[in-house]
């Protein structure tokens, strides 16, 4: 399946919440009706969504937030289910530990898509080694940095400036002057922001 490249606002409207696909710092709430489905007539009044439909929508929402396609998402779930602990929480932790997401959380990219592009274009290093696989799992203590030749890119400078104003997650430590950050630890569920009900995804795959 090809990656979606259409209007990002349409995806947020479809899920009824801002997925922050355009910017982590600027909400779409003032720009479009998030409570109205995309299309000429929007949401059909009176239509009731089944339990399966609700579970499926939640899975689609999380896939879109993290920019992961179906086959890869299934692999993440299988790995989460294999590990000890809460499957839903572990699933989110695996997604949050992706290199493209960590680059985004550290403020080097204004969106996950932009962060993914930085990784793919070899603008990022992990522990001093160039990394170009967005799905690479970052471990506690790993140092993620922007390569010297990419530090002057306006989009990176602007994204980092906005991230500093908005505040960084507690599980990363960023040195903005050096364009590098440390992945301090895998985030706990309470530290993962976003309107996500991962238990619905567990229920879906448990059918």
Swiss-Prot record:
SMART domains, alphabetized: Ribosomal_S4 (SM01390), S4 (SM00363)
GO CC term (a single one): small ribosomal subunit
Keywords linked to the UniProt accession: Ribonucleoprotein, Ribosomal protein, RNA-binding, rRNA-binding
Ribonucleoprotein as UniProt keyword: yes
Domain S4 RNA-binding: 97-160
Organism superkingdom: Bacteria
SUPFAM superfamilies: Alpha-L RNA-binding motif
InterPro entries reported in the protein's UniProt record: Ribosomal_uS4, Ribosomal_uS4_bac-type, Ribosomal_uS4_CS, Ribosomal_uS4_N, S4_RNA-bd, S4_RNA-bd_sf
One Pfam family this sequence matches: Ribosomal_S4
NCBIfam families xrefs: PRK05327.1, rpsD_bact
Subunit structure, interactors included: Part of the 30S ribosomal subunit. Contacts protein S5. The interaction surface between S4 and S5 is involved in control of translational fidelity.
Family indicated by similarity: Belongs to the universal ribosomal protein uS4 family.
Protein name: Small ribosomal subunit protein uS4
Organism: Burkholderia pseudomallei (strain 1106a)
Gene: rpsD
């Amino acid at each position: 399946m090809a990656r979606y490249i259409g209007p990002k606002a349409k995806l947020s409207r479809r899920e009824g919440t801002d997925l922050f696909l355009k910017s982590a710092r600027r909400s779409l709430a003032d720009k479009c009706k998030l409570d109205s489905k995309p299309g000429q007539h929007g949401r059909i009044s009176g239509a009731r969504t089944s339990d399966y439909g609700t579970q499926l929508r939640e899975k689609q929402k999380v896939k879109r937030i993290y920019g992961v396609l179906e086959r890869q998402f299934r692999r993440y779930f299988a790995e989460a289910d294999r590990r000890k602990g809460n499957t839903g929480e572990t699933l989110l932790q695996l997604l949050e530990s992706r290199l493209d997401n960590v680059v985004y959380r550290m403020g080097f990219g204004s969106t996950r898509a932009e962060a993914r592009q930085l990784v793919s274009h070899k603008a990022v290093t992990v522990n001093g080694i160039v990394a170009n696989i967005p799905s690479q799992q970052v471990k506690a203590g790993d140092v993620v940095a922007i390569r010297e030749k990419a530090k002057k890119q306006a989009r990176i400078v602007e994204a980092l400036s906005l991230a500093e104003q908005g505040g960084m997650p507690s599980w990363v430590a960023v040195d903005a002057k050096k364009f590098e950050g440390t992945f301090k630890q895998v985030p706990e569920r309470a530290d993962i922001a976003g309107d996500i009900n991962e238990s619905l995804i567990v229920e879906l795959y448990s059918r």
